[in-house]
Amino acid sequence: MDFSIKACDWTKGSSNGFLTGKSDCIVIGVFESQTLSGAALEIDEATRGLLTRIIKAGDMDGKAGTTLFLHEVSGIGASRVLLVGLGKQDAFNQKAYGDAVRAAWRALLGTKIVQVTFTLAQAPILERTADWGVRAAILALRELTYKFTQMKSKPENAARALKRIVFSVNTGDEKAAKLAAKQGAALANGMDLTRDLGNLPSNVCTPTYLANTAKKLAKDWKLKVEVLGEKQCEALKMGSFLSVTAGSVEPAQFIVLQYQGGAAKAAPVVLVGKGVTFDTGGISLKPGEGMDEMKYDMCGAGSVLGTLRAVAEMGLKLNVVGIIPAVENMPSATATKPGDIVTSMKGLTIEVLNTDAEGRLILCDALTYAERFKPAAVIDIATLTGACIIALGHHNSGLFSKDDALAGELLDASREASDPAWRLPLDDEYQDQLKSNFADLANIGGRPAGSVTAACFLSRFTDAYPWAHLDIAGTAWKSGAAKGATGRPVPLLAQFLIDRAADGRATQ
């Protein structure tokens, strides 16, 4: 799809191309009120009160999510007008805007309309700007049109009529809106990559497949890539990472990608993504019901690849490193057993009390490896704990950090990107739950505060830099009829990096 921006003076709707421009359809928002404003007022005046008459007749009341097509309206250049109910104006926040946008896209996607003039981004969204509305609309459309059918014998490649979307904004918003459109397309492309990787079955998306995907990404976007095999990881004394792959015939891959958009010596942001391409639980075997969804246990890795793709497409002026420890966690005669003790790259010994708490075992060595980049910040992303789902459900990702400034940046980014996260505690008192009689620490801390103790475990390997942990177990994919990867938290991570790139620290 092609996205473009058309700037105009909205106070002169009928004389500057806003209403007279040719297209298949123009999308107009109508608030739940007898008083028209914005684009709706302009179109009402241009049509001698048509909208006023429609509202009085009860055909469109402006209630949230309602839509109405008008055909061949005199005085309007578009062949059709799509009216979209926006609800109450004083409650028109980012959620209400998202609902309205999705209602509009659904109505349009059911037609043969090819080109649309879209005005909803210029509506008065509470605490948001028109450029934010442009980007959000692009992401909503791309989410609605995403389909994963490539594993079917006859993939569904039904061509959609809708090809071109022109966002109509005020002249003063043009520059920001053009940047937002570019960002929206890049984010959508990154999210699609993340979704595709998550939705692939684990017999296709193996650690080697992730490594090959990283290599292709590096070739396409001029990134630097290095893939360490098991012998190289042994030489680096990554005993914790390698303990997880011990039961699998699939070779582990330790993937490192580098994007150089900032100054050569500028400290990078490092993203570490959990890449367990299938998690049976190992010897601590999971129940069979729902185990198919454990192909999504590599969504942290997928989000790192998707974010790097988006960053490269946007050309952000900062340095980013992606680290992906990729393994399968399988039971076999050679698998790590409960009670085994392994030695991490940092030198700390770990008693593996539960082999299904494997994500932290691969992440801890990746976090130690990250030290060599002298990072400005490190963020790990992992489908780490079911406890996080119990705590937060499927709306917020769990955020853990002892660095208030870094946590604040990530929370601000989550709100701006509509990719919410919630900060959870990381108090030192929880560390006591990880004590072991036989090793420096255990890999689990019991049932209480399971997501917190998992983060506490990771924190033991992050003394050298500012660090945050995102537990995306509840947000990386959906179950049930809408089963599939969500592409989260690519928007959050990308927004964090956009904000960092706008800060002088990123290029120094």
Swiss-Prot record:
Binds 2 manganese ions per subunit. The active site is at 286, 360. This is Probable cytosol aminopeptidase. It is found in: Cytoplasm. It is an enzyme of class 3 (hydrolase). The gene is pepA. HAMAP family: Cytosol_peptidase_M17. It comes from Paraburkholderia phytofirmans (strain DSM 17436 / LMG 22146 / PsJN). GO terms for biological process: proteolysis. Mn(2+) 1 binds at residues 279, 356, 358. Presumably involved in the processing and regular turnover of intracellular proteins. Catalyzes the removal of unsubstituted N-terminal amino acids from various peptides. One of its GO terms (molecular function) is metalloaminopeptidase activity. Its EC number is 3.4.11.1, 3.4.11.10. Mn(2+) 2 binds at residues 274, 279, 297, 358. The lineage of its organism: Bacteria, Pseudomonadati, Pseudomonadota, Betaproteobacteria, Burkholderiales. Keywords: Aminopeptidase, Cytoplasm, Hydrolase, Manganese, Metal-binding, Protease. Belongs to the peptidase M17 family. It catalyses: Release of an N-terminal amino acid, Xaa-|-Yaa-, in which Xaa is preferably Leu, but may be other amino acids including Pro although not Arg or Lys, and Yaa may be Pro. Amino acid amides and methyl esters are also readily hydrolyzed, but rates on arylamides are exceedingly low; Release of an N-terminal amino acid, preferentially leucine, but not glutamic or aspartic acids. InterPro entries: Leucine_aapep/pepB (IPR011356), Macro_dom-like (IPR043472), Peptidase_M17_C (IPR000819), Peptidase_M17_leu_NH2_pept (IPR023042), Peptidase_M17_N (IPR008283). GO terms for cellular component: cytoplasm. Its cofactor is Mn(2+).
